[in-house]
A protein has these predicted regions:
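ATP/adenylate-binding site constellation spanning eukaryotic-like Ser/Thr protein kinases
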Residues: 19, 59, 78
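Thiol-based oxidoreductase modules, predominantly thioredoxin-like and allied folds used
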Residues: 37-50, 61
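Short Asp/Glu-rich motifs
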Residues: 51-52, 73
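Short amphipathic alpha-helix with an adjacent loop that forms part of the alpha/beta core around
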Residues: 52-57, 83-85
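Non-catalytic, surface beta->alpha helical segment in thiol-disulfide oxidoreductase systems
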Residues: 67-88
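Structural micro-motif
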Residues: 57-65
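Local sequence-structure signature of Cys/Sec-based thiol-disulfide redox active-site neighborhoods
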Residues: 2-37
């Protein structure tokens, strides 16, 4: 799991940053939906400020999954996401 991104506010709910054209973003959302994990979706194609914030932190790949507490994963596999959720 990656460290905390200083410029990203600590979310109260798991937050997924991605785009509608991203296959990994769809897979991540399907996984979260399938496990009934509540999350907030931020479409970077519609939210320029969020996209700029991620880019300013060197995060150019999606999805970026930010967990409560501020830790984040970039392009996590389903097993990586499951482990992060179990640890949070």
């Amino acid at each position: 799991m990656s460290s905390i991104i200083p410029a990203i506010p600590d979310p109260e709910i798991l937050t997924v940053y991605g785009t509608t054209r991203c296959g990994d973003c769809h897979r991540t959302r399907r996984y979260l939906d399938g496990t009934q994990t509540p999350y907030r979706w931020v479409d970077l194609g519609q939210d320029d400020a969020a996209r700029d914030m991620l880019h300013a932190n060197g995060l150019l790949a999606v999805p970026v999954v930010v967990l409560p507490g501020g830790r984040y994963l970039v392009e996590p596999s389903d097993p990586e996401l499951a482990a992060a959720l179990a640890a949070s």
